[in-house]
């Protein structure tokens, strides 16, 4: 029986291994992690991450051919194929700080694999890593090999949170990069045969190692670039009276462009986009390509501009001050159908409002109060380090309350900011919300969730990203 072990029980490792176990009942799959609370959660009824469909997959396989364990060395030693899905955070100090990927956890995993292995292994990069990481890992394993043969493969994930299980069931493509040697091709074929249990052969792409590593960074950079492009146009729409939804629809009808990732918003978030672009920028700089690096930097600059522009709009609309005013924030996750708050635009928006001394009341259906307070208290890149290295008792913001529903959040509020596109926010009783808010009552829709005209009929003053401005807002000071 083939045995697969995955090091890292996070957003990628857990769901990916669960689906492999479901689709390959003859393969034993073990997910290992040094975090006992995380493994305990995977073995409980309350999984550590929220993802539609994940519960059902885990419950069907767990205890049959899917296992979660803290006995890392035992299962690594026994495995034929080892997936490494550990954090690759952005460095916070030293060479490349603020841009380069920190491969500390990857290197530790590689050294541990070399220490405990007693048979040949296929080691698979699942984490997003810089180009040429496989070469570095290969050197560590080879120099500590004790006669054992290691083949390194790159198999980047292309999952979107909120649809991860569907993405795993029906992927656009599965990318496998390996060495162009007889042993390398054999290793690629071994991993290909795992995915072939449910993925059509024409969707399994094989490349060399470096192409696979760069493809992941490039894919995320291209997606983020589309979001920043439409967000840049949204600012121009507001200035000219155009409607970004209409513009995006017209542009997306061009078959060369297509409609996906053309929704204007308060900005992109998530664990990958900004981190991977910064990594790409650093790689370009290291390879003497400053013009290319500067091109990709602009994607992040527009994203930061969009968030600060949103905060400025809130403050300037409300008589140029939100000091002491209650502002309701609906949605804290970086997008709907996930509880993930990593790099969520809500953090920067809340910080901007808190900087102007607002009182903030937050509601998100999937994010806990502890997580929200932790996110608001943490430094820029702290979120991407293991839990035991994060602040254990973050200082709670006295101006922030986290509540159990949207109606409680908006009660007596002066303004309402929609920062995540949860479906439930489309069907709220906005008349009830309006009746319980201070007047004038403002709605700042950072996700274009609501119908601005219907809300204006109720009495709200409405700002929607990239839409023609409310008459009230036209008379307010210009937003920088």
Swiss-Prot record:
NAD(+) binds at residues 8-13, 33, 38, 86-90, 127-128, 161, 272-275, 342. Belongs to the UDP-glucose/GDP-mannose dehydrogenase family. Keywords: NAD, Oxidoreductase, Phosphoprotein. It catalyses: UDP-alpha-D-glucose + 2 NAD(+) + H2O = UDP-alpha-D-glucuronate + 2 NADH + 3 H(+). Its EC number is 1.1.1.22. One of its GO terms (biological process) is UDP-glucuronate biosynthetic process. Substrate binds at residues 157-161, 216-223, 256-269, 334-335, 447. GO terms for cellular component: nucleus. Involved in the biosynthesis of UDP-glucuronic acid (UDP-GlcA), providing nucleotide sugars for cell-wall polymers. It comes from the Eukaryota. Pathway: Nucleotide-sugar biosynthesis; UDP-alpha-D-glucuronate biosynthesis; UDP-alpha-D-glucuronate from UDP-alpha-D-glucose: step 1/1. The modification Phosphoserine is found at residue 393. The active site is at residue 272. This is UDP-glucose 6-dehydrogenase 3. Pfam families: UDPG_MGDP_dh, UDPG_MGDP_dh_C, UDPG_MGDP_dh_N. It comes from Oryza sativa subsp. japonica. Gene3D superfamilies: Cytochrome c1, transmembrane anchor, C-terminal (1.20.5.100), NAD(P)-binding Rossmann-like Domain (3.40.50.720). One of its GO terms (molecular function) is UDP-glucose 6-dehydrogenase activity. The lineage of its organism: Eukaryota, Viridiplantae, Streptophyta, Embryophyta, Tracheophyta. The keyword Cell division does not apply.
């Amino acid at each position: 029986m083939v045995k697969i072990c995955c090091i890292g029980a996070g957003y990628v490792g857990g769901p990916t291994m669960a689906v492999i176990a479901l689709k390959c009942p003859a393969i034993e799959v073990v997910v290992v992690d040094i975090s006992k609370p995380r493994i305990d959660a995977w073995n409980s009824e309350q999984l550590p991450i929220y993802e539609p469909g994940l519960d059902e997959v885990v419950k069907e396989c767990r205890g049959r051919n899917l296992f979660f364990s803290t006995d890392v060395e035992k299962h690594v030693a026994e495995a034929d194929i080892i997936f490494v899905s550990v954090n690759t955070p952005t460095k916070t100090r030293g060479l490349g700080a603020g841009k380069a990927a920190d491969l500390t956890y990857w290197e530790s995993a590689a050294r541990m694999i070399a220490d405990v292995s007693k048979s040949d292994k296929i080691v698979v990069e699942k984490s997003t890593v810089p180009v040429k990481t496989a070469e570095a890992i290969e050197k560590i394993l080879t120099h500590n090999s004790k006669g054992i043969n290691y083949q390194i493969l790159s198999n980047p994930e292309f999952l979107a949170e909120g649809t991860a299980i569907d993405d795993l069931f029906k992927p656009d493509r599965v990318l496998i990069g390996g060495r162009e040697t007889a042993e390398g091709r054999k290793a690629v074929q071994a991993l290909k045969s795992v995915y072939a249990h449910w993925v059509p052969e024409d969707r399994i792409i094989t490349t060399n190692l470096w192409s696979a590593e760069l493809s992941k960074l490039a894919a995320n950079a291209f997606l983020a670039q589309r979001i920043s492009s439409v967000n840049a146009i949204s600012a121009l729409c507001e200035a000219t009276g155009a409607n970004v939804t209409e513009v995006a629809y017209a542009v997306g009808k061009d078959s060369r462009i297509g409609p996906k990732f053309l929704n204007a918003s308060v900005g992109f978030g998530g664990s990958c986009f900004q981190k991977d672009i910064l990594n790409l920028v650093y790689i370009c700089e290291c390879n003497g390509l400053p013009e290319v690096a500067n091109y990709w930097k602009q994607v992040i600059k527009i994203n930061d501009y969009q968030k600060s522009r949103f905060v400025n709009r809130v403050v300037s609309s409300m008589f140029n001050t939100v000091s002491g005013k209650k502002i309701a924030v609906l949605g804290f996750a970086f997008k709907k159908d996930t509880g993930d708050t990593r790099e969520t635009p809500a953090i920067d928006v809340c910080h901007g409002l808190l900087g102007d001394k607002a009182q903030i009341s937050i509601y998100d259906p999937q994010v806990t109060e502890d997580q929200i307070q932790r996110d608001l208290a943490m430094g820029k890149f702290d979120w991407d380090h293991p839990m035991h290295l994060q602040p254990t008792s973050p200082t709670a913001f006295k101006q922030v309350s986290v509540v159990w529903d949207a109606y409680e959040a908006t009660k007596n509020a002066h303004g309402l900011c929609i920062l995540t596109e949860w479906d439930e926010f489309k069907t709220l009783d906005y008349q009830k919300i309006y009746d319980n808010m201070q007047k004038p009552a403002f709605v700042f829709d950072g996700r274009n969730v609501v119908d601005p005209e219907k809300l204006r009929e109720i009495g709200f003053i409405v700002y929607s990203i990239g839409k023609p401005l409310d008459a009230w807002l036209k008379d307010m000071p210009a937003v920088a």
